Amino acid sequence: MKRLKRKRLLLATLFAMVGIFGTYFFSSSWEPLILIVSIVGCILFLLLSILTPSLEKQLDRMEGREFEEWLADLFETAGYRVELTPASRDFGADLLIEDERGYKIAIQAKRYSAAVGLEAVQQVAASVPFYGMDEGWVVTNSTFTEAAYQLAEPNQVRLIDREELLAFAKEMNLH
């Protein structure tokens, strides 16, 4: 996702530079240049706004591993040390994160269109002792079933749903 933003920014910058130098070269005057640069800037802003899907749509279009990688970027931006586990045989955790104090969290990432149920809570609860973590989280772009909430509480598993995830991403300026 970051590469896509960089490419768009580079393309917009290159387009603006060509416009600036082309206008000056053909007119040898800065007045039309200022007008054209302003117009080009407005057009680029509008195009990027229209062509860039919202964070919600981006999340919903991601595949499972892509969602895990996006979460890794999000938690790195928030200051955590992040390790992605293997795509298969991950023993219930997709990411292992650690804060600046050394507090370790196992994360089970679920990119679902339906509500996340018991299985995700069971997976991350099992991964906490396996990886030597302090806590387990299940993070989703969706919601959780009531049964997931009931199982999470006694197992000290934190559930982060779509609303909380989007708020955190926006706070980290990843929208």
How would you describe each model-predicted region?
Residues 1-91, 96-175:
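Mixed-charge (Asp/Glu-Lys/Arg
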